[in-house]
Amino acid sequence: MAVFYFCKECGNVFTSVNKATVNCCGETWNPLEFAGEPNEKHQLDVKVENGKRIYTSHHPQTDEHYFAFIAFECKCGTTKIRYFKPNEEVRFCLDEDKHGKLYWFCNLHGLYEMEV
């Protein structure tokens, strides 16, 4: 399972295969913790088009409150990450036949996951 870190100062996202000591902006960061089940605002919508699963969200993307990334970890161990900035549309595409875990992170509420 991938381990994720997020720097609250500059917005950098770090990943590792195992827990690690991660430093950024003069601070040591702990691994992100799971926020539990996403409420309606933190859920991802999915539609299938031309053999692709397209994940989107109606989550706010303001400077203060936004999804910083969506990541997919394939069962083979490969990770694909899409980073988002405030005011950027949340959109993440996967081949329909890919299976594994999808992770997404809200800078205020934490990390979410689901099997896909």
What are these regions (language model features)?
Residues 54-57, 89-97:
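Exposed aromatic-hydrophobic patches
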Residues 7-10, 22-24, 106:
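Short cysteine-rich clusters marking metal-coordination/redox-active sites
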Residues 108-116:
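Edge beta-strands of extracellular beta-sandwich domains
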Residues 35-86:
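Long, charge-rich boundary regions
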Residues 1-2, 16-19, 101:
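Flanking scaffold residues of small Cys/His-coordinated metal-binding clusters
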Residues 18-29:
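Cysteine-rich micro-motifs
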